């Protein structure tokens, strides 16, 4: 017969601790969270870039119309 009994616990494997819930991984770096400790952020200032974009779009549309009329 075996010298170890099935009913005796040897203490090699202690009982696991009580879990408080499933493990949640932290969000990736830079991901906004609901943590309000970083709420002191300076306001963002926007700057006008002028009307260069609008002029460029109008020039492109005129160029397309001229090419369409020529060919």
UniProtKB/Swiss-Prot annotation:
Coiled coil: none annotated. Involved in resistance to abiotic stress. The lineage of its organism: Eukaryota, Viridiplantae, Streptophyta, Embryophyta, Tracheophyta. It comes from Arabidopsis thaliana (Mouse-ear cress). Induction: Induced by heat in roots, but suppressed in shoots. Accumulates in response to cold, drought, oxidation stress and salt. This is Protein CYSTEINE-RICH TRANSMEMBRANE MODULE 4. Belongs to the CYSTM1 family. Residues 1-31 are annotated as: Disordered. It is found in: Cell membrane; Cytoplasm. Residues 1-12 have a biased composition (Polar residues). The keyword Zinc does not apply. The chain crosses the membrane at residues 48-64. Keywords: Cell membrane, Cytoplasm, Membrane, Transmembrane, Transmembrane helix.
């Amino acid at each position: 017969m075996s010298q170890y009994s099935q009913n005796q616990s040897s203490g090699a494997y202690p009982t696991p601790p009580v879990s408080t819930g499933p493990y949640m991984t932290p969000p990736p770096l830079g991901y906004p969270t609901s943590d309000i400790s970083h709420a002191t952020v300076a306001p963002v200032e926007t700057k006008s870039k002028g009307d260069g974009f609008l002029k460029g779009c109008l020039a492109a549309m005129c160029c397309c119309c001229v090419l369409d009329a020529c060919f």
